[in-house]
């Protein structure tokens, strides 16, 4: 009977806790390019207009809606090590040998008291701690992004993404950031190391991704377990 009485309370606690567990969400889908109505250039009678390509300029992304290929090559490694050692020791002893002859009276009050050895203490502690951490990440991919905004200084805001599905497992790559037109090569390719405020997300969704995390009950118990 006690078990049935406690069960509703546990279910209420689980319900409260599960609402607080927030799973990390990947970056949102790329923002669609703004529909900008291009100005109608005046034709001064020439065969070439500003709306067409130039004979003296590479065919690179430079306007809203243009696409650019991003070569993603991210490599990062970090390590940290720390150690601490402390120690302290102290000792103290005190006794009463002669004090106007009253040291004998102290011994007469209690036969277990020795006036010559009243206090004798010692203290010692030691601490030794160490820790180390290391991390290494590599990401190599190619992604086509779209210019979604042109800043007043000429820099371009880009965003893009792609999804590859293999055996019902989705591999998702999302990217957004700011690039300079000068960093775009003649083949209309820009390296990810030249992207300002780059946000690159490489996530997965499917059976394999679900198996890489504990079950929901395990996560709940790990969250509320006080020991």
UniProtKB/Swiss-Prot annotation:
InterPro entries: Flag_Lring. A lipid is attached at residue 16 (S-diacylglycerol cysteine). Keywords: Bacterial flagellum, Cell outer membrane, Lipoprotein, Membrane, Palmitate, Signal. GO terms for molecular function: cytoskeletal motor activity. It comes from the Bacteria. One of its GO terms (biological process) is bacterial-type flagellum-dependent cell motility. It is a lipid-anchor. A lipid is attached at residue 16 (N-palmitoyl cysteine). One of its GO terms (cellular component) is bacterial-type flagellum basal body, distal rod, L ring. It holds the Pfam family FlgH. Residues 1-15 form the signal peptide. Disulfide bonds: none annotated. Its main location: membrane. It is found in: Cell outer membrane; Bacterial flagellum basal body. Assembles around the rod to form the L-ring and probably protects the motor/basal body from shearing forces during rotation. The basal body constitutes a major portion of the flagellar organelle and consists of four rings (L,P,S, and M) mounted on a central rod. Belongs to the FlgH family. This is Flagellar L-ring protein. It comes from Syntrophotalea carbinolica (strain DSM 2380 / NBRC 103641 / GraBd1). The gene is flgH.
């Amino acid at each position: 009977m006690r078990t049935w009485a406690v069960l509703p309370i546990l279910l209420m606690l689980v319900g409260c806790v599960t609402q607080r567990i927030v799973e990390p969400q990947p970056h949102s889908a790329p923002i669609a390019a703004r529909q900008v109505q291009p100005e109608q250039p005046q034709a001064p009678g020439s065969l070439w207009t500003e709306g067409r390509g130039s004979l003296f300029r590479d065919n690179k992304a430079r306007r809203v809606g243009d696409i650019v290929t991003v070569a993603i090559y991210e490599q990062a490694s970090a390590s940290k090590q720390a150690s601490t050692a402390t120690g302290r020791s102290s000792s103290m002893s005190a006794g009463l040998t002669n004090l106007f002859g009253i040291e004998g009276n102290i011994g007469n009050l209690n036969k277990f008291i020795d006036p010559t050895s009243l206090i004798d203490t010692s203290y010692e502690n030691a601490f030794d701690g160490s820790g180390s951490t290391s991390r290494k990440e590599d990401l190599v991919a190619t992604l086509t992004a779209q210019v979604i905004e042109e800043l007043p200084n000429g820099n371009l805001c880009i965003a893009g993404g792609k999804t590859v599905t293999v055996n019902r497992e989705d591999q998702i790559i999302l990217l957004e950031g700011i690039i300079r037109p000068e960093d775009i090569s003649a083949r209309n390719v820009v390296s990810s190391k030249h992207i300002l405020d780059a946000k690159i997300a490489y996530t997965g969704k499917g059976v394999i991704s679900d198996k890489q995390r504990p079950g929901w009950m395990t996560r709940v118990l790990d969250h509320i377990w006080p020991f």
